[in-house]
Design a protein with these regions (language model features):
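Conserved beta-strand positions in repeat-built beta-propeller and related beta-rich domains
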Residues: 54, 70-75, 108, 114-131, ...
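Beta-propeller blade signature
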Residues: 132-142, 325-336
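Bacterial N-terminal signal peptides
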Residues: 28-40
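N-terminal secretory signal peptides that target proteins for export/translocation
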Residues: 1-24
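Short loop/turn segments that connect beta-strands within beta-propeller blades
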Residues: 83-87, 141-146, 185-189, 234-239, ...
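A short beta-strand motif characteristic of beta-propeller blades
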Residues: 46-52, 88-95, 146-153, 192-204, ...
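Beta-rich, blade/repeat-based domains predominating
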Residues: 53-69, 96-121, 153-171, 199-220, ...
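Asp-box/WD-like beta-propeller blade repeats and closely related beta-sheet repeat scaffolds
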Residues: 130-168
């Protein structure tokens, strides 16, 4: 009972923190919760947006090389799947394997796995499915959707945000409310606190770790949402090395999801932009690809197209709560500009 009360207090604190972030992030009209990005490599292209269920508030999107898209739901939970040219259909049922609200999702084709960040966000005023407490990394079979594993983030304050997978099959997980990056080695029974650093800690009234990606150089890169920053975490023999803040060529606004894009990265900025980030040494060149996006939260690459999830989260936890958010889509953006 005492543990449950502690979880409830932490959930409420997270809710207040998110409300504060809403006001600071996008004023009275927008909110972008920290989201995941995933990489796919096929040349499949589609010009029309892909619809997802009404009032599902997509919080993350990922893909496979054939152009299949997977999107999680912030409020309903579960994961929907859309084959190239097809409609979104339920793939992971809400509440499956004890899951709650779905944040980051990542398809790992090499390992045949779908990673899902599951969180109890009742403190945000969003009950979601089920009654599991805390933050979890859920793992499902990418082909069948069958549950493959469930791994709790150990800190009761944790918020499982996003996932990256290294060349050895290890999964890295960002935690928005602690200064920790967790690691799940292949075959491991639990997550380990892989990297912890004061630079990664959430600022007062801010939101910490968000996007996460393994770069072409083999190092790990992460974003923090408020204040918006980029960091490199060196990887040597599988262990975390130095944490370095990168100097950006322009100011970035609410740095959200990030994933590898060739030798660079794709970055979602919560204020409505998709950008390309190229790192050289301790500096990062930031070039805008698209702007004017409606509360974007995630992106995944399929060939020359970036599929952006416009989460419109202000309509469920922000200043637009109670208003009609309109239809939800995954929006295609050309990456050849």
């Amino acid at each position: 009972m005492n543990q449950e009360r502690s979880v409830t207090r932490n959930s409420l604190a997270q809710g207040e923190l998110l409300k504060s972030r809403s006001a600071r992030a996008l004023g009275t009209t927008g909110l972008a919760l920290m989201l995941g990005v995933a990489l796919g490599g096929a040349a499949f292209a589609q010009s029309a947006p892909v619809g997802v269920p009404d009032k599902s508030f997509p919080e993350s999107v990922t893909s496979t090389k054939d152009g299949t898209l997977y999107a999680g739901s912030f409020n309903l939970g579960g994961v929907v799947k859309a084959s190239p040219g097809g409609k979104a259909e339920q793939f992971i049922q809400p509440g499956a394997a004890g899951s709650r609200s779905t944040l980051g999702v990542l398809a790992d084709e090499k390992g045949g796995l779908l990673y899902v960040c599951s969180n109890d966000i009742t403190g945000f005023g969003v009950p979601g499915p089920g009654d599991t407490k805390g933050a979890w990394l859920k793992v499902f079979d990418l082909a069948s959707g069958a549950p493959k594993g469930s791994y709790g983030l150990p800190d009761p304050k944790s918020l499982c945000n996003d996932i990256a997978v290294g060349s050895d099959g290890s999964a890295y997980v960002s935690d928005s409310f602690t200064p920790n990056v967790y690691k799940l080695k292949p075959g491991a029974a639990a997550l380990e606190a892989w990297a912890t650093d004061p630079l990664l800690a959430p600022a007062k009234d801010g939101v910490g770790l968000d996007g996460i990606a393994v770069g072409a150089d083999g190092n790990l890169y992460v974003t923090t949402f408020i204040p918006a920053k980029l960091f490199k975490i060196a990887i040597k023999d599988g262990k975390a090395g130095a944490v370095t803040e990168l100097k950006t060529s322009r100011a970035i606004d609410h740095a959200d999801a990030m994933r590898a894009f060739g030798d660079s990265f794709l970055l979602i900025e919560g204020a409505g932009r998709l950008a390309k980030v190229t790192v050289k040494g301790d500096e990062a060149q930031v070039d805008t690809i698209a702007e004017g996006l409606a509360e974007p939260v995630s992106v995944t690459q399929v060939g020359n197209t970036g599929w952006v999830a416009e989460g419109k989260l202000s309509y469920i936890i922000g200043d637009n709560k109670g208003k009609d958010p309109g239809p939800f889509t995954l929006k295609p953006v050309s990456l050849t500009k």
